[in-house]
């Protein structure tokens, strides 16, 4: 299945939470979820009792949409998380958080992960002084993520940084230098996403 190309706000309404897919609009009262906090469609306002499988599937879909990844990619992340030491669900979240496009978003260079993915793919981002144009690239502690010098004059990036969004504790931002550093690996408490990752583990453990 290809990448979803429909209205982004429908996905937020489907999952019942803000997925921050539309950038700046998501931080304002114009967000459709604030006006219509129910699922889209003719029966969207009806309360439906989900089965256990339905709940597991809903959590997986929520996580995939939050990070903007496809099923095949998601399965690869899950399989890698299973092989790591520790709790599989938390390992999965850590891997997704370490994606370069997510880090570019978290540092405030972009207002959405989709925009961050474009900045990376178009060669505007460097890791440790070298261009990296792979959105799925996994960062590690000590890595320095920066905007390429020739791209620092872009109004888009400057305006995004001026918004002054909070940066998670596992990252640090030097706004004046257009760069951020990975201080540590992200832990569960750093990830402000209301997802029940244990349900995803149950789904794939069947």
UniProtKB/Swiss-Prot annotation:
Q: Name one GO biological process term.
A: ribosomal small subunit biogenesis
Q: Which Gene3D superfamilies match?
A: Ribosomal Protein S4 Delta 41, Chain A, domain 1, RNA-binding S4 domain
- On whether Signal is a keyword of this UniProt record, the answer is no
So which domain of life are we looking at? Bacteria
Ranges for the S4 RNA-binding domain?
98-161
Annotated CDD domains: S4
> What sections of the protein cross the membrane?
none
| PROSITE patterns (UniProt xref) | RIBOSOMAL_S4, S4
UniProt xrefs under InterPro entries = Ribosomal_uS4 (IPR022801), Ribosomal_uS4_bac-type (IPR005709), Ribosomal_uS4_CS (IPR018079), Ribosomal_uS4_N (IPR001912), S4_RNA-bd (IPR002942), S4_RNA-bd_sf (IPR036986)
Q: Which GO terms describe its molecular function?
A: rRNA binding; structural constituent of ribosome
Q: What is the stated purpose of this protein?
A: One of the primary rRNA binding proteins, it binds directly to 16S rRNA where it nucleates assembly of the body of the 30S subunit.
Q: Which family does it belong to?
A: Belongs to the universal ribosomal protein uS4 family.
Q: Which NCBIfam families does the UniProt record give?
A: PRK05327.1, rpsD_bact
What quaternary structure, including any partners, is listed in this protein's UniProt entry? Part of the 30S ribosomal subunit. Contacts protein S5. The interaction surface between S4 and S5 is involved in control of translational fidelity.
What protein name does the entry list? Small ribosomal subunit protein uS4
Q: Which organism is it from?
A: Caldanaerobacter subterraneus subsp. tengcongensis (strain DSM 15242 / JCM 11007 / NBRC 100824 / MB4) (Thermoanaerobacter tengcongensis)
What's the name of its gene? Answer: rpsD
């Amino acid at each position: 299945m290809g990448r979803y190309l429909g209205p982004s706000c429908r996905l937020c309404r489907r999952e019942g939470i803000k997925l921050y897919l539309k950038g700046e609009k998501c931080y304002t009262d114009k967000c459709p979820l604030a006006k219509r906090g129910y699922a889209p469609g003719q029966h969207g306002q009806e309360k439906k009792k989900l089965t256990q499988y339905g709940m597991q599937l809903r959590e997986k879909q929520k996580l995939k949409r939050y990070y903007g990844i496809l099923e095949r990619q998601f399965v690869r992340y899950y399989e890698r998380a299973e092989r790591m030491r520790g709790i599989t669900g938390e390992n999965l979240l850590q891997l997704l958080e370490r994606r370069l496009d997510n880090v570019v978003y978290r540092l405030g260079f972009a207002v959405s992960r989709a925009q961050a993915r474009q900045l990376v793919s178009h060669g505007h981002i460097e890791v440790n002084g070298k261009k990296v144009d792979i959105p799925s690239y996994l960062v590690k502690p000590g890595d320095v993520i920066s905007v390429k010098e020739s791209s620092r004059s872009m109004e888009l990036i400057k305006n995004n940084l001026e918004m002054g969004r909070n940066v998670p504790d596992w990252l640090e931002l030097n706004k004046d230098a257009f760069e951020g550093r990975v201080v540590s690996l992200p832990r569960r408490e750093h990830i402000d996403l209301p997802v029940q990752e244990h349900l995803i583990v149950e789904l794939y453990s069947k």
